[in-house]
Amino acid sequence: MSKILVLNDKFENSGELELPASYAEVNPHNLYLYVKSYLAGMRANTAHTKSRAYVSGGGKKPWRQKGRGGARAGSTRTNVWVGGAVAFGPTNEKNYFQKVNKKQKRLALECALAQKAEAGKLFAVDSLAVESGKTKDAAKIIEALNLRDALIVKDLLDDKTLLAFRNMANCYVVDASEVNAYLVSVFSSVIVEKAVLQTITKEG
């Protein structure tokens, strides 16, 4: 059974919670499909080459068809000519979007959470608010748990908490409404508020 480590106000272990049994039964392929789709959606699509339709010039036949003893040519902009077009090259018109069903997104998140819980890297606390808005106070949370990096999932993310974690290269803070399977997977540890956990683990 996948267990979530519950922490007190001093970020010390104070108990455990169990994820729904169905989480451990999710096919990991759902997580693979979601991450693949997410990364495809992040592609900038800047690679671009010009085909013969877009290369300037080359409209005039460079020499007559017969009689010179050389190979025939109809344009100076074919892909075999220097300064010519590119054959079958990438264009910025390509759409890399990969559809993932809503149910698959949900299953992917469940699988990612189950994997983190199984590894003992999913933590739940009452509150992650950093009222001072200072990075040094936010860093104490990570130092107390001795974590390399962490995804911080906050219920109703406020500006001060965002400012506190924003300067930390090994942390990323996100509102509960924006958490997804990719973010859960890419960080070695996940810290969530209990209220968030009750929402995202609600079955059905």
Curated annotation (Swiss-Prot):
Name under which the protein is recorded: Large ribosomal subunit protein uL4
GO cellular component labels: ribonucleoprotein complex; ribosome
InterPro entries named among the record's database cross-references: Ribosomal_uL4 (IPR002136), Ribosomal_uL4-like (IPR013005), Ribosomal_uL4_dom_sf (IPR023574)
PANTHER family assigned to the protein according to its UniProt record, in alphabetical order: 50S RIBOSOMAL PROTEIN L4 (PTHR10746), LARGE RIBOSOMAL SUBUNIT PROTEIN UL4M (PTHR10746:SF6)
Keywords: Ribonucleoprotein, Ribosomal protein, RNA-binding, rRNA-binding
Presence of the UniProt keyword RNA-binding in the record: yes
UniProt key word RNA-binding: yes
Organism, scientific name: Campylobacter curvus (strain 525.92)
Listed GO MF terms: rRNA binding; structural constituent of ribosome
